[in-house]
Amino acid sequence: MIPKEEIMGIFEKYNKDEVTIVTVGSHTSLHILKGAKLEGFSTAVITTKDRAIPYKRFGVADKFIYVDQFSDISKEEIQQQLRDMNAIIVPHGSFIAYCGLDNVEDTFKVPMFGNRAILRWEAERDLEGQLLGGSGLRIPKKYGGPDEIDGPVMVKFPGARGGRGYFPCSSVEEFWRKIDEFKAKGVLTEDDVSKAHIEEYVVGANYCIHYFYSPLKDQVELMGIDRRYESSIDGLVRVPAKDQLELDIDPSYVITGNFPVVIRESLLPQVFDMGDKLVAKAKEEVNPGMLGPFCLQSLCNENLELVVFEMSARVDGGTNTFMNGSPYSCLYTGEPLSMGQRIAKEIKLALELDMIDKVIS
C-alpha cells in the first residue's frame, strides 16, 4: 500500500488554488465531473477518443486526457500528467477495474478521494463478508462450496463485473451444468470458478442504498436509493411462464441501467442504522474506514427486514439516477444535490479547513 505520507508529500507540491477533479470517462463520471464544476473546480476526464463524445456533448470536462486503452491509466506518464494538473482522482468501479486494484494500492501515486485501502474489502468476498457480518448487518447465508448447496442459492464472482456471469441454482448438478455453459460462452474462466461465491437466495424487493460519510462532519448521510435494470432477467419476466419453459433460456443478471426508488418511511431508521454500523466497523477494520460515498445493496423481505448482499466501498453506478438530486439528498439543503457534487463539496471544505488529509489517500 502506498504510504499516506507519500501521497500527502505529492499533494503538498500542488497549487492548492488550481486543483483539478479527474476520473475515468465511464461509470459515474458525468455527475462526478458536473458536480465538481458546480463547486468551482477544474475538471478532466481520462478517455479513449472513441468514448469521448458524451463528455464533449454534455460539457462536463475542461480537459481531456486521451489514452489508447483504459488500462494505460496506470502508466507513469499518465500519472505524471495528472500530478502536473494538481489532480485529485475520484475512483469508481470502472477506474478500479481498468487501473487494477494492485496498481491502485501500490503504484498509482496520484492523490485519490477516499480510502484506497478499503477497496480490496469490496473486491474480495471473504473480506466483504467479514466487514458486513462484523457490522451486525443481516447478510445471506454463505456456502463453502457447491457440494453444500441444499436449496436456492445465488452464485457470484469477484470484481466489478456488473452482474455478468451471476446465476441462481438449487443443486450441485445445476451448479456445474451452468458453470460449463458459461465457460463455453467465454463468460467465465477457471480462475473465476475457483473464486465462486455461493450464498442464500433471498426473496425480496431490491434496494440499492447510497450513503455518504463525511469525515469532516462525522456524519452518515442518505443520498439516494435505486434499483437495477438487468438483462436478460428483466426481459424474461415479461414472457408468460409457459413460454419461458418452452424457450429454455437461463437468465443473466448483467446491469444495463438503473432507476430511482424511494423506500417506505418507516424503514428509514433501519437504513440509517445500517450505514452507521458499517462506518463504525470499517474504522476498526481498515482505518480511517469508509470515506465519502458507499452503497449497500439489499433485499427487503416480507418481514420488512433489509438483508445486505453486497456493498460498494466507493461511488456506485446507481448514483446516476440522481444527477440532479434525489428525494433524499435535497432534504439536506433544499437544493438538488448529486453524489458528484457532494464529493466536490467535501473536497472544497477540506481545502478551506486545511484538512485535505482527512479525505484523500
Curated annotation (Swiss-Prot):
Q: How is the cofactor bound?
A: Binds 1 Mg(2+) or Mn(2+) ion per subunit.
Q: Which InterPro entries match?
A: ATP-grasp, ATP_grasp_subdomain_1, IMP_biosynth_PurP, IMP_biosynth_PurP_C, IMP_biosynth_PurP_N, PreATP-grasp_dom_sf
Q: Which GO terms describe its molecular function?
A: ATP binding; ligase activity, forming carbon-nitrogen bonds; magnesium ion binding
Q: Which Pfam families match?
A: DUF1246, DUF1297
Signal peptide positions (record): none
Annotated positions binding 5-amino-1-(5-phospho-beta-D-ribosyl)imidazole-4-carboxamide: 27, 94, 258
Where along the chain is ATP bound? 146-208, 230
- Cofactors per UniProt? Mg(2+); Mn(2+)
| Coiled-coil intervals | none
UniProt domain ATP-grasp: residue ranges: 116-348
Q: What class of enzyme is it?
A: ligase
Q: Which residues bind Mg(2+)?
A: 297, 310
Q: Which UniProt keywords apply?
A: ATP-binding, Ligase, Magnesium, Manganese, Metal-binding, Nucleotide-binding, Purine biosynthesis
Tell me which SUPFAM superfamilies the record gives. Glutathione synthetase ATP-binding domain-like (SSF56059), PreATP-grasp domain (SSF52440)
What's the EC number here? 6.3.4.23
Record pathway: Purine metabolism; IMP biosynthesis via de novo pathway; 5-formamido-1-(5-phospho-D-ribosyl)imidazole-4-carboxamide from 5-amino-1-(5-phospho-D-ribosyl)imidazole-4-carboxamide (formate route): step 1/1
Domain of life where this protein originates: Archaea
Query: Which reaction is the catalytic activity of this chain?
Result: 5-amino-1-(5-phospho-beta-D-ribosyl)imidazole-4-carboxamide + formate + ATP = 5-formamido-1-(5-phospho-D-ribosyl)imidazole-4-carboxamide + ADP + phosphate
- GO BP term, example: 'de novo' IMP biosynthetic process
Q: What's this chain's function?
A: Catalyzes the ATP- and formate-dependent formylation of 5-aminoimidazole-4-carboxamide-1-beta-d-ribofuranosyl 5'-monophosphate (AICAR) to 5-formaminoimidazole-4-carboxamide-1-beta-d-ribofuranosyl 5'-monophosphate (FAICAR) in the absence of folates.
Database matches in NCBIfam families: PRK13278.1-5
Q: Which family does it belong to?
A: Belongs to the phosphohexose mutase family.
Q: What is this protein called?
A: 5-formaminoimidazole-4-carboxamide-1-(beta)-D-ribofuranosyl 5'-monophosphate synthetase
Q: Which organism is it from?
A: Methanococcus maripaludis (strain DSM 14266 / JCM 13030 / NBRC 101832 / S2 / LL)
